[in-house]
């Protein structure tokens, strides 16, 4: 992309005066005399985004201008998230051209002002190449660049911040303030609390110190308040404590205790879902927690030895603990509630380029940026699929040369941004300008591996990922050394020259040891080797412009803006996804990477069509016609019957960590059946493999996660019998495919019923629920207040409406799901031991009806349990009765009644098969849930109500692009 005209190195304090000729910029994608915008076809589109749950319009802007090849989803996200100016005013951006120009022209001007370019012509080529890469979704800056650059507001370009706190009240209060200002700007922050005295140490006044866990409470409340004060996403926040801190056990247990509190409150009837009205009363819910462990501790765990907890004031050991027992407590806590994560201190600092300026103590909330305290990092991610050359016949290669040139372009732009960037605090601004940390990374790794026929958990897949990562970071540091020759090394380089060069040698040595696997990765390794040789040579001569170059971020919103199939280093979520259509609507499609992989593996077009059709029908490759079993692993995804194992994720992290300056944002997902020992294995093996940090998430471990939709059976044999009987009944009943109209099934004159008296918040009432003699609930009568009153009349009308609906076949569970959790007065305590708290009379009524008439699995999925079941859960960990307690006959009788239908004359047709009525999914995450019968671990989007999906250690909304992280 660029060539360097050499000149003597000089300090970056010289305010941009050039010592050499600057960068000579080479055209790679663009044509002389033709602007990149003129090479593509543009069209006008309407962006109307709704909350599909209630139909309300969240965002609307019509007539926006985008290239024809941009997907509907990418257009929606960029328009709603990144266009600036009030909608409906002349100041509002209406075209992608305006957005890209706002950014690239700012970067060009700053580059010219700071003497980066050899000539105005080179500056123009830089602008055009940068515009082309953004226009064609080859890479993306992190969200703050899109939000702020070129606008009147502060030019904040960094998404990741690390703060610090000392053992003084002034410093602690400054922490609260600085963190709040960063949250206000939509970014995230992390810090290490280990300098704060433990609760086991004395104050100068003679009393005991509060300890860091106590001060975490105030910071957590602050983060929650700022979120509720108008932000569309949760504040991203990380707190870390060293494993040798005397309060480490309290820190480990903070979220476990709160999770137990959440469960108790939920069982009492409070709304404890993520984002629920009552969850705000629970502490420590706004941060990720991580324990920083060192090699001494991990070796003590390995050997079964003791480990010393040290005073913050004197450094002396004040308590010895069993290392293995403490490690077990960490694993138990993570198993129970997904926190704490783990960071490996000695591994992190062994790769530290600036140890003379301080240790690496903290990280950003997603754990990919790790450097000095009070610093920041601006991120950018490359779309790896844009560099795959595929002739459509199975012949593939990775364009390493073009990839390297784009990396050079992006690193240059990222470094220029530090020249004009604003920062939330003076300390962060000074340190970031002095050390100039960058975080280039990539997205779509999972898609690239599948497209090239590599299993995610395979030696070939890891080799390809490692080669690309090594080339990216090697090229980045080479460009950094070239920039140092023109505009000088970073201010802290002189003090840290020796350790910085040592780390470069470590990267280079790891590159030399890497195993080459096939025709795809071998040329990339060769290019990476050349890059690292240049790094060592130029770095020795010029120094480096940047103290850090690369991280792997979650790439949440920006990944969707680039139309990436996968985020960060994640594997594909599933083989079938949703594609939004221009003009509205959507369709299910099999990933385009699937046929690419099949061609690479040598399958013929007829075979590929059959396999793709099987995937479209079943959502997986199992028993796909003509697909060899040894190729199944290529199509393994994050979820499903053939999901990638936890250690498969860890091995991929270990394969690319040696060539990343920072770390990797990654959560290792475990199935609900995983044990504490499995968590211990992941944490221990990751340390042995050289990973810097990770977190785990065991499915269904948190109350805030939607309940699993997969029902549990009584016994496997009974399941088989029930299935056979059901299929026989269906075959007997469904003989023709006809058009139906529902009819009302009235109750007989004499009908069994239950009358229940109740009080809700002091208001008394009676409910009579009458049933069909053998087939479920048929009508409901409610008696409240005196006859003739408004409330009594409304209850009568409501009862009639519900009863008529039941008699026309509306399932009771539909009413229950709609009317539970409605909030209005009267509300509060009830006299019913099974429903201790009700948010309204309607909430109580339908919880009571669910308990009386719905089968266990149905109401359990809705979070409704009797007092006996809640007690059983406390004792055994399960709401479900044991096998000898089950009344199978009773369950069958209480099953929901099939709707009676009358046929209207239509042509006769034979029934091919009886399938459940299709549910309506709105995102790929929800489609996966339908196919797999389980619900993905994810909250609902605060903006549009869509189910979010994981992106690294964060969540991303596929519908509107909102993210819980910082990219």
UniProtKB/Swiss-Prot annotation:
Disulphide-bonded residues: 160-377
Alphabetically ordered keywords of this record: Cobalamin, Cobalt, Disulfide bond, DNA synthesis, Nucleotide-binding, Oxidoreductase
Region spans: Disordered: 1-23
Binding site for substrate: 143, 159-160, 188, 364-368, 554-558
Cofactor mode of binding and number, as noted: 5'-deoxyadenosylcobalamine (coenzyme B12).
Swiss-Prot/TrEMBL catalytic activity: a 2'-deoxyribonucleoside 5'-diphosphate + [thioredoxin]-disulfide + H2O = a ribonucleoside 5'-diphosphate + [thioredoxin]-dithiol
Cofactor(s) needed for function: adenosylcob(III)alamin
Family indicated by similarity: Belongs to the ribonucleoside diphosphate reductase class-2 family.
Other known facts: Can grow normally using either of its two RNR systems.
Function: Catalyzes the reduction of ribonucleotides to deoxyribonucleotides. May function to provide a pool of deoxyribonucleotide precursors for DNA repair during oxygen limitation and/or for immediate growth after restoration of oxygen.
Name under which the protein is recorded: Vitamin B12-dependent ribonucleotide reductase
């Amino acid at each position: 992309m660029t060539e360097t005209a050499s000149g003597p190195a000089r300090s970056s304090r010289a305010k941009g005066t050039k010592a050499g000729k600057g960068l000579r910029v080479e055209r790679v994608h663009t044509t002389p005399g033709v602007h990149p915008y003129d090479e593509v076809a543009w069209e006008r589109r309407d962006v109307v985004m709704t909350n599909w749950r209630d139909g309300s319009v969240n965002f609307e802007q019509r007539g926006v201008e985008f290239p024809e090849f941009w997907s509907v989803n990418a257009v929606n996200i960029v328009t709603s998230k990144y266009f600036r100016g009030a909608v409906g005013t002349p100041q509002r951006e209406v075209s992608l051209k305006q957005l890209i120009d706002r950014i690239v022209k700012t970067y060009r001007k700053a580059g010219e002002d700071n003497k980066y370019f050899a000539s105005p012509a080179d500056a123009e080529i830089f602008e055009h190449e940068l515009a082309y890469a953004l226009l064609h979704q080859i890479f993306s800056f992190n969200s703050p660049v899109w939000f702020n650059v070129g606008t009147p507001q502060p030019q904040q370009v960094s998404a990741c911040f690390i703060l610090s706190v000392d053992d003084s009240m002034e410093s602690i209060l400054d922490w609260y303030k600085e963190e709040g200002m960063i949250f206000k700007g939509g970014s995230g922050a992390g810090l290490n609390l280990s300098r704060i005295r433990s609760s086991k140490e004395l104050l100068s006044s003679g009393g005991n110190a509060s300890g860091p866990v106590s001060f975490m409470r105030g910071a957590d409340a602050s983060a929650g308040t700022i979120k509720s004060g108008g932000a569309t996403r949760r504040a991203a926040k990380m707190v870390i404590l060293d494993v040798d801190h005397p309060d480490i056990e309290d820190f480990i247990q903070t979220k476990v205790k709160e999770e137990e509190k959440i469960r108790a409150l939920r069982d009492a009837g409070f709304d404890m879902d993520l984002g629920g009205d009552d969850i705000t009363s629970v502490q420590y819910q706004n941060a990720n927690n991580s324990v920083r462990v060192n090699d001494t501790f991990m070796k003590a765990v390995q050997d079964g030895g003791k480990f010393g907890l040290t005073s913050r004031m004197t450094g002396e050991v004040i308590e010895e603990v069993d290392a293995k027992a403490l490690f077990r407590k960490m694993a138990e806590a993570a198993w129970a509630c997904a926190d704490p994560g783990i960071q490996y201190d000695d591994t992190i600092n062994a790769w530290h380029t600036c140890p003379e300026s301080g240790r690496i103590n903290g990280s950003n909330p997603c754990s990919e940026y790790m450097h000095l305290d009070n610093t920041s990092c601006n991120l950018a991610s490359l779309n790896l699929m844009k560099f795959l050359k595929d002739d459509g016949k199975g012949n593939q290669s990775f364009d390493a040369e073009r990839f390297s040139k784009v990396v050079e372009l992006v690193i240059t732009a990222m470094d220029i941004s530090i020249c004009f960037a604003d920062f939330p605090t003076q300390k962060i601004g000074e340190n970031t300008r002095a050390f100039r940390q960058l975080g280039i990374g990539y997205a779509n790794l999972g898609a690239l591996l599948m497209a090239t026929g590599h299993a995610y958990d395979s030696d070939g897949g890891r080799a390809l990922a490692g080669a690309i990562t090594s080339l990216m970071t090697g090229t980045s540091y080479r460009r950094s050394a070239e920039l140092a020759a023109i505009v000088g090394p970073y201010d802290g380089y002189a003090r840290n020259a020796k350790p910085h060069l040592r780390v470069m040698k470590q990267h280079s040595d790891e590159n030399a040891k890497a195993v080459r696997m096939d025709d795809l990765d071998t040329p990339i390794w060769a290019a990476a080797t050349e890059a690292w040789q240049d790094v060592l040579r130029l770095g020795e001569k010029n120094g480096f412009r940047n103290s850090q170059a690369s991280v792997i971020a979650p790439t949440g919103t920006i990944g969707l803006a680039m139309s990436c199939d996968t985020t960060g280093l994640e594997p594909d979520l599933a083989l079938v996804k949703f594609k939004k259509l221009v003009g509205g609507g959507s369709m299910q499609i099999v990933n385009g990477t699937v046929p690419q992989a099949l061609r690479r593996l040598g399958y013929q077009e007829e075979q590929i069509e059959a396999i793709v059709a099987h995937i479209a029908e079943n959502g997986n490759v199992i028993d796909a016609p003509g697909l060899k079993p040894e190729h199944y692993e290529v199509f393994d995804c994050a979820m499903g019957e053939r999901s990638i194992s936890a250690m498969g994720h860890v091995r991929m992290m270990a394969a690319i960590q040696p060539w990343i300056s920072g770390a990797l944002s990654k959560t290792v997902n475990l199935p609900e059946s995983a044990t504490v020992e499995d968590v211990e294995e992941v944490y221990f093996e990751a340390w042995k493999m050289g990973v810097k940090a990770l977190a785990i998430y065991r499915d269904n471990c948190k109350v805030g996660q939607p309940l699993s939709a997969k029902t549990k059976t009584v016994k496997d044999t009974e399941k088989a019998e029930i299935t056979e009987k059901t299929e026989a009944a269906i075959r007997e009943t469904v003989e023709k495919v006809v058009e139906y109209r529902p009819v009302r099934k009235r109750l007989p004159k004499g009908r069994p019923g239950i009358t229940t008296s109740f009080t809700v918040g002091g208001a008394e009432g009676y409910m009579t629920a009458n049933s069909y003699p053998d087939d479920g609930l048929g009508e409901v009568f409610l008696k409240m207040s005196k006859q003739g009153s408004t409330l009594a009349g409304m209850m009568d009308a409501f009862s009639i409406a519900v009863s008529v609906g039941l008699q026309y076949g509306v399932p009771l569970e539909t009413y229950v799901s709609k009317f539970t959790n409605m909030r209005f007065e009267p509300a509060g305590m009830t006299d019913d031991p099974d429903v201790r708290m009700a948010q309204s009379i309607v909430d109580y009524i339908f919880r009571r009806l669910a308990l009386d008439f719905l089968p266990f699995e149905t109401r359990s999925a809705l979070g409704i349990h009797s007092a006996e079941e809640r007690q059983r859960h406390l004792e055994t960990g399960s709401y479900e009765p044991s096998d000898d307690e089950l009344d199978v006959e009773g369950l069958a009788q209480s099953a929901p009644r099939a709707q009676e239908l009358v046929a209207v004359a239509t042509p006769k047709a034979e029934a091919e098969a009886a399938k459940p009525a299709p549910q309506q999914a709105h995102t790929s995450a929800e489609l996966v849930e339908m196919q797999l019968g389980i619900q993905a671990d994810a909250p609902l989007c605060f903006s549009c109500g869509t189910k979010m999906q994981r992106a690294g250690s964060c969540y991303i909304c596929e519908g509107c692009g909102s993210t819980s992280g910082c990219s």
